[in-house]
């Protein structure tokens, strides 16, 4: 995960919310598409949870951080179903038989851990995240570590494998990082990974790349 800085909602969504009887379930396609595009642009076209690259809008969906079934204005809850600040773009959540991100999260309910507490919009939450050279993502906050592992399933085998491959390849490309020359080279490589061109990161896992900058100090 990486810190997401929220922008203003797209004008189409703002206008739609003002309509009498506006609801997310009946949202117009053009409003949905504009909202998804805005979310992808502010996230650099990577999934808000696992940070995999998203190549096109058809490979993404809008995720409600606090579920529509929970934050729906009933039982004393806020109605966040059309709140842009409660939305993010996510990947399909599956490439194997096992699911992750919002696909895995949808299997849970208020009695089994929802809504989650770890937030990609909270700087302190993101700073508590660390990555290992095995591709594992962890948090020093116990509850968040459980959410990462169980509810979001971000350590599913293929994600770990892909993170490990990138982690190792970046270090290998830098050479000997115990030297200043190696550290400087790694820093340049990582900074290139964090450059957003045309609203897009060049590849997956920018959050891990940002974390790896610690090896350059």
Give, region by region, the residue ranges found by the protein language model.
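C-terminal, charged low-complexity interaction regions
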Residues: 143-217
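Conserved, surface-exposed functional patches that form binding/active-site neighborhoods
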Residues: 102-177
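Short, charged surface segments at domain edges that flank catalytic/cofactor-binding sites
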Residues: 2-49, 71-82
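Histidine-centered nuclease catalytic patch
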Residues: 52-109
């Amino acid at each position: 995960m990486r810190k997401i800085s929220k922008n203003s909602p797209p004008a189409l969504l703002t206008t739609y919310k003002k309509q009498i009887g506006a609801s997310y379930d009946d949202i117009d396609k053009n409003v949905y598409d504009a909202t998804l595009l805005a979310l992808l642009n502010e996230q650099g076209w990577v999934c808000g949870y696992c940070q995999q690259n998203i190549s096109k809008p058809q490979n993404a969906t809008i995720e409600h951080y606090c579920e529509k079934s929970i934050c729906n204005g009933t039982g004393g809850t806020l109605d966040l179903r059309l709140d842009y600040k409660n939305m993010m773009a996510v990947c399909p959540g599956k490439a194997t038989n096992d699911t992750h991100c919002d696909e895995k999260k949808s299997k849970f309910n208020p009695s089994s851990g929802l809504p989650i507490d770890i937030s990609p919009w909270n700087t302190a939450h993101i700073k508590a995240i660390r990555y290992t050279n095995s591709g594992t993502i962890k948090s020093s906050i116990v509850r968040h570590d459980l959410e990462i592992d169980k509810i979001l399933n971000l350590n599913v085998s293929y994600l770990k494998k892909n993170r490990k491959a990138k982690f190792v390849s970046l270090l290998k490309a830098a050479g000997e990082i115990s030297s200043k020359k190696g550290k400087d080279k790694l820093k340049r490589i990582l900074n290139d990974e964090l450059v957003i061109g045309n609203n897009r990161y060049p590849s997956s896992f920018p959050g891990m790349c940002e974390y790896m900058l610690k090896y350059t100090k």
